[in-house]
C-alpha cells in the first residue's frame, strides 16, 4: 500500500507505476514522471534517491525530456527503478512520506499536468496480428475462401508506419483529404474521406536496440521490451482501399496515430500473463517460444458524438485474442538484421475477438458500412462523423486493484477545404 491515497478503481496503484512525460503551467519543461493514484511523482526531483548499483551511475536520465535514455538502459535499470519507487512510495517508508518539503516539490496532480509523447519515436511499425480481424477483413474484401493470405499463419505481417504523426492522447485528428475511387466504373476523385475509422490497438516501446545486421533471438526478445500503451490507429478506409495495392497502407493511415501517455512497464503486466494462443501450423523455429507472453488486458472503445451527453461503448475486447505475440513481432522485425532503437514503437494491429461486440474497428462493427452501430441517444454510425470523440481504455483486473493505462482519446476535426 502507498502513502498516496489510491482508489480501488484507479488505473495507477503502486502495483502499476507507469512512466510518462509531463509539464505544468508553473514549469513548462517536459519531464519524466510516474503515475500513482491521481498524482504524478516527478523523477527529476527525486533522482538522487536512486542509489542502486545501476541507477546511481545514471541518475541523469531522469533529467531528460523523454524516456529514450532510460529505456535504453535495459532490464536491470528498469527493475531497480521499479523496486526503488515501490519502496519510496510504500506507506511504511518515511524517507519521502515524511519529508514535507520534498513531497511538495515532487508531486503534481494529474489534473494540472499536460502530458506529452513519452519518447522520441524514431520508427513506428504496425503489425496485423489478430486472426479474427485478418479473417473479417479478408472475408469483406476477398471472400470467405480467400480470407487469409498464404503468409498470414506463418509470420507476423506488418508494415512501416509514419512516426512523425504519432500523437499523444487528447490531440485532435483532422479528417484527411485524399484520392479515392468510390465507383469502379468512374475515374478516382479527390476529397475528404467519407469512411474514417478507428482501430483498437496496443503497442510496445523498444528498450535496448540491436546492432545493425544482428537479429534479436526470440530467447532474448523480452529483454528489449520496455512497456505498453494503448493505441488508436486512425484509418481512412476509402483512401486505403484505393491506394494499398501493391505496396500496402500509405495515406490512409499516415495522417494520425494516437497513443496513451502512460507506458505501463512489463513487470506490472506479468501477473496477468496468460497462455499463448495455439498456433497451427507451428511457426518456424526462429519464431517459437514456450514461455507464456500474452496478457489478459480488458479493452473498450467508447464514442461520444457532438451533442451527446455521455459516451457509448461500442466495443469490448481483450489483448489475449492476439494470434502473434509481441516476442514474435520483435524477433521477426529484426530477423533480417534490421536494427531497432530505444523508443521505437511496435503496434499490435487491430484487436478483435470472435464475438461481434469485440470487433476492434468500425469497418468490422458495421461490416463494411452495411450495418448501423447504435451509439445511443437515437444515433447510429457506420463510420466516424466530424466532432466524434473516440476513447479507448484498458486495464488488467487484480484482487482489489487494477493495472490500467489511462485513456487514449482523440476528437475528429472537419477536413480542411481543398486548395
UniProtKB/Swiss-Prot annotation:
Copy the pathway line from the protein's UniProt record.
Amino-acid degradation; L-phenylalanine degradation; acetoacetate and fumarate from L-phenylalanine: step 6/6
Q: What is its EC number?
A: 3.7.1.2
Enumerate the residues binding substrate.
128, 142, 240, 244, 350
Modified positions (Phosphoserine) in chain numbering: 84, 92, 309, 417
EC category: hydrolase
The entry lists its GO molecular-function terms as:
fumarylacetoacetase activity; metal ion binding
Tell me which InterPro entries the record gives.
Answer: Fumarylacetoacetase, Fumarylacetoacetase-like_C, Fumarylacetoacetase_C_sf, Fumarylacetoacetase_N, Fumarylacetoacetase_N_sf
Look up the record and give one Gene Ontology term from the biological process aspect. Answer: L-phenylalanine catabolic process
Q: Which residues does Mg(2+) bind?
A: 233, 253, 257
Q: Which residues form the active site?
A: 133
Q: Which UniProt keywords apply?
A: Acetylation, Calcium, Hydrolase, Lipid metabolism, Magnesium, Metal-binding, Phenylalanine catabolism, Phosphoprotein, Tyrosine catabolism
The protein's matches in Pfam families, at most eight in alphabetical order, are given as: FAA_hydrolase, FAA_hydrolase_N
Gene3D superfamilies (alphabetical): Fumarylacetoacetase, N-terminal domain, Fumarylacetoacetase-like, C-terminal domain
> Where on this chain does Ca(2+) bind?
126, 199, 201, 233
Subunit record text? Homodimer.
Q: What is this protein called?
A: Fumarylacetoacetase
Which organism is the protein's source? Answer: Rattus norvegicus (Rat)
Amino acid at each position: 500500500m502507498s502513502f498516496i491515497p489510491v482508489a480501488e478503481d484507479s488505473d495507477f496503484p503502486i502495483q502499476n507505476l507507469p512512466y510518462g512525460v509531463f509539464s505544468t503551467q508553473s514549469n513548462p519543461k517536459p519531464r519524466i514522471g510516474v503515475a500513482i493514484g491521481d498524482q504524478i511523482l516527478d523523477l527529476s526531483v527525486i533522482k538522487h534517491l536512486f542509489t542502486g548499483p545501476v541507477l546511481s551511475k545514471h541518475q541523469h536520465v531522469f533529467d531528460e525530456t523523454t524516456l529514450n535514455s532510460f529505456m535504453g538502459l535495459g532490464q536491470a535499470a528498469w527493475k531497480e527503478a521499479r523496486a526503488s519507487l515501490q519502496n519510496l512510495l510504500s506507506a511504511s517508508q518515511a524517507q519521502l512520506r515524511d519529508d514535507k518539503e520534498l513531497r511538495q516539490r515532487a508531486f503534481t496532480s494529474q489534473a494540472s499536468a499536460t502530458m506529452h509523447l513519452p519518447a522520441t519515436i524514431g520508427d513506428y511499425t504496425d503489425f496485423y496480428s489478430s486472426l479474427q480481424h485478418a479473417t473479417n477483413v479478408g472475408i469483406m474484401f476477398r471472400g470467405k475462401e480467400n480470407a487469409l493470405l498464404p503468409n498470414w499463419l506463418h509470420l507476423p505481417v506488418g508494415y512501416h508506419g509514419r512516426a512523425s504523426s504519432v500523437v499523444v492522447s487528447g490531440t485532435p485528428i483532422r479528417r484527411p483529404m485524399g484520392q479515392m475511387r468510390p465507383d469502379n466504373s468512374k475515374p478516382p476523385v479527390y476529397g475528404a474521406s467519407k469512411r474514417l475509422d478507428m482501430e483498437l490497438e496496443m503497442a510496445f516501446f523498444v528498450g535496448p536496440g540491436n546492432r545493425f545486421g544482428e537479429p534479436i533471438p526470440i530467447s532474448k526478445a523480452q529483454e528489449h521490451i520496455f512497456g505498453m500503451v494503448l493505441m488508436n490507429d486512425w484509418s481512412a478506409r476509402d483512401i486505403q482501399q484505393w491506394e494499398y495495392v501493391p505496396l500496402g497502407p500509405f495515406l490512409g493511415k499516415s495522417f494520425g496515430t494516437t497513443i496513451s501517455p502512460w507506458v505501463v512497464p512489463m513487470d506490472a503486466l506479468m501477473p496477468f500473463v496468460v497462455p499463448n494462443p495455439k498456433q497451427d501450423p507451428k511457426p518456424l523455429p526462429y519464431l517459437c517460444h514456450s514461455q507464456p507472453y500474452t496478457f489478459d488486458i480488458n479493452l473498450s472503445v467508447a464514442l461520444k458524438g457532438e451533442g451527446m451527453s455521455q459516451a457509448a461503448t461500442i466495443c469490448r475486447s481483450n489483448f489475449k485474442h492476439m494470434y502473434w505475440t509481441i516476442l514474435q513481432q520483435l524477433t521477426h522485425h529484426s530477423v533480417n538484421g534490421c536494427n531497432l532503437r530505444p523508443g521505437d514503437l511496435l503496434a499490435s494491429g487491430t484487436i478483435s475477438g470472435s464475438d461481434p461486440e469485440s470487433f476492434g474497428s468500425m469497418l468490422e462493427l458495421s461490416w463494411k458500412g452495411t450495418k448501423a452501430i447504435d451509439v445511443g441517444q437515437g444515433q447510429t454510425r457506420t463510420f466516424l462523423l466530424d466532432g466524434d470523440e473516440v476513447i479507448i481504455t484498458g486495464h488488467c483486473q487484480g484482487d482489489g486493484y487494477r493495472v490500467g493505462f489511462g485513456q487514449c482519446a482523440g476528437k475528429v476535426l472537419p477536413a480542411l477545404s481543398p486548395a
